[in-house]
Amino acid sequence: MKVAFQRVAAAAMASCLALMACLVFVNVVLRYGFGAGIAASEELSRLLFVWMVFIGATAAYPMGEHMAFTSLLLKLRTRPRVFAAATALIRALVLLACVLVAWGAWQQFVVGLDSHSVVIGYPAALLPLPALLSSVAIGVMALVELVRREPLDFGHATDLE
C-alpha cells in the first residue's frame, strides 16, 4: 500500500513540477521574445506549487521522512515503556497539529468558496484545500499508528546522526 501511494504521490508531484516548469519557460520566452506572456502562468504555478508541497508532505509521513530530532529518542530505545510513552506523545502532538491545520484550512476553504482568482477564475478555495486534505490524511495515519501502538519509524534520520 505504501509503495503504491508513494508512486502516485511521486507522479503527481512530478506532473506539478513539469507543468510549472513548462509554464514558466513558455512565459519567459513569450515575454522577452515577443513582448507578451501568459497571464495565467503565475497564478497556475502558484496553485500547483502549493499542491505539490502538500502532496509531498503527505507522502513523506508514512516513510518517516519528516525532520525529526532523534537524539533523545534513540537513547530511550533501551527503556521500552518510556520509549512507548514518548512515541504516543509524539503521535498525539502530530494529531493535534493536524487538527489545528485542518481547522484553519477549513475556515479558509469556506471563505474561498465565494471568491475567485483574478486571472483564471478558479475558486479561491482550491488554495487551502491541499492543506486540509494533507492534514486529514496525516492525522488519520498518525491516529492509526497511535491505536496500533506502532514503533516510531526513524526513516533515514538515523543515518545522519
Predicted regions and their residues:
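Alpha-helical transmembrane segments and membrane-interface helix-loop junctions
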Residues: 1-161
